[in-house]
Amino acid sequence: MNTVVIVDCLRTPMGRSKGGAFRHQRAEDLSAHLMKGILARNPQVNPKEIEDIYWGCVQQTLEQGFNVARNAALLAGLPIEIGAVTVNRLCGSSMQALHDAARAIMVGDAEICLVGGVEHMGHVPMTHGVDFHPGLSKNVAKAAGMMGLTAEMLGKLHGISRQQQDEFAARSHARAHAATLEGRFKNEILPTEGHAADGTLFTLDYDEVIRPETTVAGLAELRPVFDPANGTVTAGTSSALSDGASAMLVMSEQKAKALGLTIRARIKAMAVAGCDPSIMGYGPVPATHKALKRAGLTMQDMDVVELNEAFAAQSLPCAKDLGLLDMMDDKVNLNGGAIALGHPLGCSGTRISTTLINLMEAKDAKYGLATMCIGLGQGIATIFERP
């Protein structure tokens, strides 16, 4: 089978969903901007050679409906011969898009694919139009459909304290802010047009979601938001609401070499797994174990890890059971995570993979893991290898 490689990866800045810079930009705009941008950065690639576009998106309605991948490709002016499909595995959608593209390349059905994802949570809220089947309650706790309550449950089962959650959240903002100041996001962010508070157009080249002023003491003053009486999960220890898109240029290693492109990473292994929906945030653990087994590697072999921060109460149990708690400052979410940057659902899979690849390059790392939990009880994981 063909070896699948990443030759480039990009993302928009993360915009605040409430009155943020992208409030007048649509999901298709963000997506098309990245599609054009990643091809402009790689002029050796003839767009007509792209077989398919795989684009993750969760709320596929309103501006994100009717196959947003195809809409964005047409908006970007890409050749009409390129196919496009919108992929939905909830929070893992764009990572699933990467897996789908990788398999097409592995078996020879494609040589080049454009991969990514988008979510404009300001325009299309996460709960818009959600209508669970009443019969689900026979098999699944009703609270399993409320992500914050699943985080509360997972945190309680693993003895995660409020203090630990506040410290983890403060770390996320501090690391993301430091990464911004030190220019560590510069290579992965494609400056994107947005609107300032007064409505004037400007180019955003930083993540406006990060709150540099965040402290443990400040977080400790917030009230639990999902279980006000007995809970520990607050808005401050949950992933921020943000708007954004991410993209990757994926191809066979043979094609990359023929085009003279630098191979930034290879896909070493991929996996998905299910878990109890009531503790949906635990999904990264079984998914990671599967991926490691398929790669013939161990957790110790992973030099850098991106664990999507849906909630602090969810991330910490996963880090604990993956044996990462003692390695956090050396390996895990070194540039912060979704608590600081936000979790635009369909965008996050390729967003964390993009951040991971840039970190691997900065640290001259061999192996990296990107993994995330998925609503209703799933996990997804990808292991990358640098050449």
From Swiss-Prot:
EC category name: transferase
Main location: cytoplasm
Active site: 91 (acyl-thioester intermediate), 343 (proton acceptor), 373 (proton acceptor)
Cell location: Cytoplasm
Gene Ontology terms for molecular function: acetyl-CoA C-acyltransferase activity
GO biological process: fatty acid beta-oxidation; phenylacetate catabolic process
Catalysed reaction, written as an equation: an acyl-CoA + acetyl-CoA = a 3-oxoacyl-CoA + CoA
EC number, as in UniProt: 2.3.1.16
Source superkingdom: Bacteria
InterPro entries, per the entry: FadA (IPR012805), Thiolase (IPR002155), Thiolase-like (IPR016039), Thiolase-like_sf_Thiolase (IPR050215), Thiolase_acyl_enz_int_AS (IPR020615), Thiolase_AS (IPR020610), Thiolase_C (IPR020617), Thiolase_CS (IPR020613)
UniProt KW keywords: Acyltransferase, Cytoplasm, Fatty acid metabolism, Lipid degradation, Lipid metabolism, Transferase
A Gene Ontology term for the protein's cellular component: cytoplasm
NCBIfam families with a match to the protein in the record: AcCoA-C-Actrans, fadA, PRK08947.1
Subunit architecture: Heterotetramer of two alpha chains (FadB) and two beta chains (FadA).
Function: Catalyzes the final step of fatty acid oxidation in which acetyl-CoA is released and the CoA ester of a fatty acid two carbons shorter is formed.
Family assignment from sequence similarity: Belongs to the thiolase-like superfamily. Thiolase family.
Protein name, UniProt field: 3-ketoacyl-CoA thiolase
UniProt organism field: Vibrio cholerae serotype O1 (strain ATCC 39541 / Classical Ogawa 395 / O395)
